């Protein structure tokens, strides 16, 4: 009985020690990464279009290196110094749906895709991977993000669209804002 308790205690202690702390790797900002997915049903490519910094992060801060859902694509952020995975996100893209159409057999097209990632404190490697329906790698693209890079555009601090809160139930870390937009 003592052995079982000690083994159980060991596993609980080691599981808690692996928990990743958001503040160790990320700032309270958002990195918007814009990509262009291009190609046809025979050949695909991914190109980096633009990097932008937004004023705060409103995404998850726990279980950062785990995939909450499985899609036909993934973004993996690794700490450049250690190679450790510090953030993962899955997605499904319109580009990959389009690849199954008849048009994709005859012509190549490009689709814009934007992803919001937590803003790293240190240089990080970002990898985008697209999968086939059988979960084989279709194409991938890696690039380095250096947080102090002057080519990362700062957005969201000026030219903010006028808005008003009808009800503010708490701070942004605990509540979700709902926007109501008129048609037209």
Model-assigned labels for residue ranges:
Residues 25-160:
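Beta-strand-enriched, solvent-exposed domains that form extended recognition/catalytic surfaces
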Residues 15-19:
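Sec/Tat signal peptide C-region and signal peptidase I cleavage site
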Residues 4-13:
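Sec-dependent N-terminal signal peptides
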Residues 8-9, 20-24, 35:
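Short non-domain terminal segments
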Residues 151-184:
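Fold-level signature of zinc-dependent metallopeptidase catalytic domains
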